[in-house]
Amino acid sequence: MLKELRQKRPLVHNITNYVAAQFVANGLLALGASPLMSDAIDEMRDLAKISDALAINIGTLNDRAILCAKEAIKHYKALNKPIVLDPVGCSASALRHDTSLELLKSGGISALRGNAAELGSLVGISCESKGLDSNDAATPVEIIKLAAQKYSVIAVMTGKTDYVSDGKKVLSITGGSEYLALITGAGCLHAAACASFLSLKKDPLDSMAQLCALYKQAAFNAQKKVLENNGSNGSFLFYFLDALSLPIELENSLIKEEW
C-alpha cells in the first residue's frame, strides 16, 4: 500500500494547527504524499476539486477555523472525497467538544482519529488523558467500536496500542516508540497520513490498520537510530522523518483482530 501511495502521490489538503503545520507537511512529503496547507475559507470549493483527501485538525481552534472546516466538509462531501477529523483536546473544553460533534454530525467524515480521552468524550465515556478512568468499565475496544457505530466512521484510536474499527470489527496495532509522545505534531501528522491512505480507495479498515502499523514501525526504526547515536527528542524527530521516507518493513508492529 505504501508503494502505491508513493506512485500516486495524493494531494492531501490540511486544515491543521499552526504549531504542527510544517512538521505535517514534511511528514507527508516523506511518506510519499503531497501536502496542501490552507485555511482560507473562500478557496475551499476550488481546493476540494483538486485534492484527493482532507484532514481537519482542531488543535488551535478559533472561530475562523470552525467556519473553514464546515465549508471544506461541505465541498469534499459533495465530491465524495475522504475526510479525516482529528478532534484534538475535545475532552478539554466545551468549544472543542461541541465543534467536534457538529463536524461529525455533518455526515461527511470518513475517519475519526484521536486518543482514548478524545474518543471517549465523543461517546459519553469519561477517560483520563493518560488512559481510562479506573472507575470506568469501558475498554478501548468498546470505546472505539462505539465511536465507529455512533458516527458511521472508521474510528482510529492511537496510544501505546492503536485500535481501528468499522463498528463491527476491531483491530489492534502494537509496536512503536515512546518518543512519539515526546514530540509535537506526531498525532497531527498521523491524521494527515490517515487521509492520504484513505485516498487510495482501498478497504478503509485495512487501510487504517496498515497506516498505523507503518507509522509505529517507522517510529521504532527512528528510535533505534536515536539509541545508536545517544540522541533524544530532537534527533528522533529528524530520524522519524527519515524513517517515513524509506522502505518500511513490518518487523516490530503487529496487527491483531480483537473483535
From Swiss-Prot:
GO molecular function terms noted in the UniProt entry: ATP binding; hydroxyethylthiazole kinase activity; magnesium ion binding
Originating gene: thiM
Coiled coil start-end: none
Catalytic reactions on record: 5-(2-hydroxyethyl)-4-methylthiazole + ATP = 4-methyl-5-(2-phosphooxyethyl)-thiazole + ADP + H(+)
Function text: Catalyzes the phosphorylation of the hydroxyl group of 4-methyl-5-beta-hydroxyethylthiazole (THZ).
Protein name in UniProt: Hydroxyethylthiazole kinase
Protein family per UniProt: Belongs to the Thz kinase family.
Organism of origin: Helicobacter pylori (strain ATCC 700392 / 26695) (Campylobacter pylori)
Enzyme nomenclature, EC number: 2.7.1.50
Keyword Ribonucleoprotein applies: no
Pathway membership: Cofactor biosynthesis; thiamine diphosphate biosynthesis; 4-methyl-5-(2-phosphoethyl)-thiazole from 5-(2-hydroxyethyl)-4-methylthiazole: step 1/1
Keywords annotated in UniProt: ATP-binding, Kinase, Magnesium, Metal-binding, Nucleotide-binding, Thiamine biosynthesis, Transferase
Name of the top EC class for this enzyme: transferase
Residues given in the record as substrate binding sites: 37, 185
